[in-house]
Amino acid sequence: MTEKPEIWTIRKVLDWTRGYLAEKGVENARLETEWLLSAALGLDRVGLYVNFDKPLNPEELAACRGLVARRAKREPLQYILGTQEFCGLDFVVTPSVLIPRHDTEVIVEEALRRAPHAAAVLDIGVGSGCIAVALAKQLPHAQVVGVEQSPGAIALAQRNAERHGARVTLFEGSLFEPLGDQRFDLIVSNPPYIPTADLEALQPEVREYEPRAALDGGSDGLDFYRLIVPAAPEYLNPGGWLMVELGIGQAETVLGMFSRTGFCDCFTAQDPNGIDRVVGGRIG
Ligand SMILES: C[S@@+](CC[C@H](N)C(=O)[O-])C[C@H]1O[C@@H](n2cnc3c(N)ncnc32)[C@H](O)[C@@H]1O
């Protein structure tokens, strides 16, 4: 007598994967399982539920296994699925770029609120292009420029700008170096700001997969503010704004840098968790 082959229905794969990913330390294992299996099977999440009792064929099972194995090694879901939503737009993401965070939407909101008529905008450290593209979409008459040192990130930012029909001019280089005598009404930046010693304690998704050059802000995390804040006035038109994203506990020190550099109307803005996430100021 031959044994009956085991039948893996969608329900059974979902249940097994949810437990497996939770065991591997994945938060939100239930939701992530649904996204992974949806991607592997080419279904939306409702499609999974209405096909609960459908047995999977060997190819479908192999596709599920491949994606689940990657997530079990703590590769970020966004790199596996290839996209992340930001400001209502879908961005292609690869390991060349930091995955856009929802907290970063605060700098976009502040920029649009305080500088709605900016005609020339600069984003330093453009990464996936999320801030630059979101601003270009909301300020269609503005010239938006992005600077980035990573060639892989520049290529992806270009792809994301084209995907959304956003006019963003990209320069490869460090900070203000590629800009010559251009001047801006608004400069935004989400620079690397994690203190070097804290990198090892980050979640494996961040520590092992996201680009270190997007995270490491030097010994106290403030290296990039020390470079950007004093240099910015030379690249701002009169009345122009500088706004930077920052990490927990950095606002007071960065505000001090703004005041000492001569910025006025300085402000801090909080993320949805009440953490000071953005500092900004205007040049007189
Ligand atoms: C924290 S990530 C932000 C990416 C994107 N703007 C976002 O908000 O998701 C910082 C970015 O700055 C880039 N970067 C690091 N050093 C740089 C430098 N000296 N000049 C320009 N870009 C730099 C990194 O490659 C990375 O893409």
UniProtKB/Swiss-Prot annotation:
Please give the catalytic activity noted in the UniProt record. L-glutaminyl-[peptide chain release factor] + S-adenosyl-L-methionine = N(5)-methyl-L-glutaminyl-[peptide chain release factor] + S-adenosyl-L-homocysteine + H(+)
Function (record text): Methylates the class 1 translation termination release factors RF1/PrfA and RF2/PrfB on the glutamine residue of the universally conserved GGQ motif.
Gene assigned in the entry: prmC
Q: What is this protein called?
A: Release factor glutamine methyltransferase
Which segments cross the bilayer? none
Which UniProt keywords are present, listed alphabetically? Answer: Methyltransferase, S-adenosyl-L-methionine, Transferase
What EC numbers are recorded for this enzyme? 2.1.1.297
Provide the residue positions that the database annotates as binding S-adenosyl-L-methionine: 125-129, 148, 190
Query: Which InterPro entries does UniProt cross-reference here?
Result: DNA_methylase_N6_adenine_CS (IPR002052), HemK-like (IPR004556), N5-glutamine_MTase (IPR050320), PrmC_N (IPR040758), RF_methyltr_PrmC (IPR019874), SAM-dependent_MTases_sf (IPR029063), Small_mtfrase_dom (IPR007848)
Against Gene3D superfamilies, the record matches this protein to: DNA helicase RuvA subunit, C-terminal domain, Vaccinia Virus protein VP39
**Which protein family is it in?**
Belongs to the protein N5-glutamine methyltransferase family. PrmC subfamily.
